[in-house]
């Protein structure tokens, strides 16, 4: 295992964060992002999920149709778990995004799973998924895979096996 690498990122959105690559394995790695300055807070269903001091710990797993992120507040308390449903995560090399020699990428398939702390997980953005199919951004087959992946994530989160 290599020591964690750090990179501080800044966007045109008035947002800064620091990413540490915690652990690197052949088929996955775990990142830990801590938010710095922000022009506005990010929320899901009126629950703040990103503000200065909040951390997103993300598991990127090659070949999976999802990326799971645990969200912690500035005290380290669990706020919730957010999951992007996506094309199969694939390994890429020489990425500057995470400050590591290797990384993973995916294509977002519009559907997400959200689990607030101590509650059951549920789907987000089903309407966006259907719009994406209707507009030709993704295929009906990809949408079906997305729904299957979301069901799998809900099962995983429901069993707390992440």
Language model features with spans:
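Cysteine/selenocysteine-centered motifs that mediate thiol-based redox chemistry or coordinate metal-sulfur cofactors
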Residues: 148-162
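Short acidic-glycine loop/turn motifs at beta-strand connectors
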Residues: 25, 74-75, 116-120
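Charge-rich, low-complexity N-terminal segments
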Residues: 1-52
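Short beta-strand-initiation
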Residues: 16-17, 108-110
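A hydrophobic, small-residue-rich beta->alpha segment in the mid-to-C-terminal subdomain
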Residues: 109-152
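Generic secondary-structure microfeatures
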Residues: 35, 85-89, 117
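Hydrophobic residues embedded in beta-strands of well-ordered beta-sheets
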Residues: 29, 78-79, 121
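Structured beta-strand/loop patches that form or line metal/cofactor-binding pockets in enzymes
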Residues: 49, 57-108
């Amino acid at each position: 295992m290599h020591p964690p690498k750090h990179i501080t990122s800044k966007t045109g959105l008035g947002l800064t964060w620091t990413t540490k690559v915690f652990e690197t394995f052949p088929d996955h790695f775990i990142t830990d992002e801590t938010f710095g300055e922000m022009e506005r807070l990010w929320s899901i269903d009126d629950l703040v999920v990103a503000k200065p001091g909040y951390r997103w710990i993300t598991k990127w797993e090659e070949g999976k149709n999802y990326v799971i992120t645990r969200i912690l507040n500035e005290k380290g308390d669990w706020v919730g778990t957010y999951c992007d449903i996506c094309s199969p995560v694939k390994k890429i090399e020489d990425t500057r995004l995470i400050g590591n020699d290797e990384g993973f990428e995916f294509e977002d398939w519009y559907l997400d799973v959200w689990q607030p702390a101590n509650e059951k997980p549920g789907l987000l953005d089903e309407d966006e998924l259907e719009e994406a199919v209707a507009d030709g951004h993704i295929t009906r087959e990809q949408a079906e895979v997305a729904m299957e992946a979301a069901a799998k994530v809900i099962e995983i989160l429901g069993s707390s096996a992440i």
